[in-house]
Amino acid sequence: MAKEQVQAITKMEEDFAQWYTDIVKKAELVDYSSVKGCMILRPYGYALWENMQKVMDEKLKATSHENVYMPMFIPESLLQKEKDHVEGFAPEVAWVTHGGDEKLAERLCVRPTSETLFCEHFSKIVQSYNDLPKLYNQWCSVVRWEKTTRPFLRTTEFLWQEGHTIHETAEESQAETLNILNLYASFCEDYLAIPVIKGQKTEKEKFAGAKATYTIESLMHDGKALQTGTSHNFGTNFSEAFDIKFLDRNGKWQYVHQTSWGVSTRMIGGLIMVHSDNNGLVMPPKVAPVQVVIVPIAQHKEGVLAKATELQGHIQKVARVKIDASNKTPGWKFNEYEMKGIPIRLEVGPKDIEKNQVVLVRRDTKEKEFISMDQLEERIPALLEEIHNSLFNKAKVFRDENTYSVTSFEEMKKVADEKQGFIKAMWCGELACEEKLKEEVGVSSRCMPFEQEHLAEECVCCGKEAKQMVYWGKAY
């Protein structure tokens, strides 16, 4: 059965989209529901999200952010208060029109995001500069009625965290925006082993209603970019629309400066597409629901299960570990846990017990070694760290090898047609050039990176004076 499972995974080189779908299903991360675009997060998938959520929640609380919960429903009149915001989300909004058989006096939007609710609340609770800042975070689900859906990457309903903060000064809100972006970047790199590029979105790509949007971008196995997280500086755009004022230190009324930021289960999609292979999922150790699986060999023989249980007791002091004592064959179990991407597999049988050793197999490299049972508590944490670093470095090498610098429109078109990955090119800052590159080359601007390079004097599209270097690419 397990071999059939492995064979059923489409090779990523043949059909990347199907390879991805096969993995999320066969690794038992999700199942499809009866509503298009709504996924069922199975225990293994939800445990992964819980581990990610736990780390992020601790980091946010350590920086004085507080968790709150806003309602799921937004009155239509409230949603329409910020013009750019409502226009940006209008095509994706799901509406509630009836309560039972009774038609509602006003339509209710099922939240696509909660800016308007936070703004309404802030306008009621802020009076003076003494009430600032307010640093709020919410864990919830949101609904966006997507036309094309794929598990984790683009779903009608998804889980996320959304942060909303208000500040006394423009400097404070800008610092918050960038601090959160850095928090997201370190989470991706230090926990998910996904290298990111930090930068600012163009006017065309920024969040509806924002003064500026900052992003972390990652490169997937198929050469497409994934926007892994965003942080927005609203300036006073929303506070003016919602009349969120405070008395400043000079006794004058001022509008608050505001931020918004979020990451979602989309990160799980990124994790899959950066690390996994044609044998299944590859889990970054720090967020893996199970870090070590023990497979007893000839478990019916006396002492084998007892020894496996003893080892579990030692290992659980340093890692998340499970024993598979089911009646399935060892071969089935090997394939099953390879499919699920568990970082380390330990095999222990009668001969191993005689030699006081176990067989240790790494999921990421398939490397096998014999290790003394007495060394496991020390070896496993070090190996998990080694696996994390190996996954990160491998992903970074892949990204760097698939990043191309171009200086002309023709060169850019040729690279976009023949290669897959990021394209670095200079840009004049004009919307017309950005749209032309989208239409004629098939790439969108991913970000204006903080780490700028001067590749040429002229814009890659129009030849006019360039203002900055931009990462371009095909994207999810």
Swiss-Prot record:
Keywords: Aminoacyl-tRNA synthetase, ATP-binding, Cytoplasm, Ligase, Nucleotide-binding, Protein biosynthesis. InterPro entries: aa-tRNA-synt_IIb, aa-tRNA-synth_II, aa-tRNA-synth_II/BPL/LPL, Anticodon-bd, Anticodon-bd_dom_sf, Pro-tRNA-ligase_IIa, Pro-tRNA-ligase_IIa_arc-type, Pro-tRNA_ligase_II_C. GO terms for biological process: prolyl-tRNA aminoacylation. It comes from the Bacteria. Its main location: cytoplasm. One of its GO terms (molecular function) is transferase activity. It catalyses: tRNA(Pro) + L-proline + ATP = L-prolyl-tRNA(Pro) + AMP + diphosphate. The keyword Nucleotide-binding applies. It is found in: Cytoplasm. Its EC number is 6.1.1.15. One of its GO terms (cellular component) is cytoplasm. Catalyzes the attachment of proline to tRNA(Pro) in a two-step reaction: proline is first activated by ATP to form Pro-AMP and then transferred to the acceptor end of tRNA(Pro). NCBIfam families: proS_fam_I. Belongs to the class-II aminoacyl-tRNA synthetase family. ProS type 3 subfamily. Homodimer. PANTHER family: BIFUNCTIONAL GLUTAMATE_PROLINE--TRNA LIGASE (PTHR43382:SF2), PROLYL-TRNA SYNTHETASE (PTHR43382). Consists of three domains: the N-terminal catalytic domain, the anticodon-binding domain and the C-terminal extension. This is Proline--tRNA ligase 2. The gene is proS2.
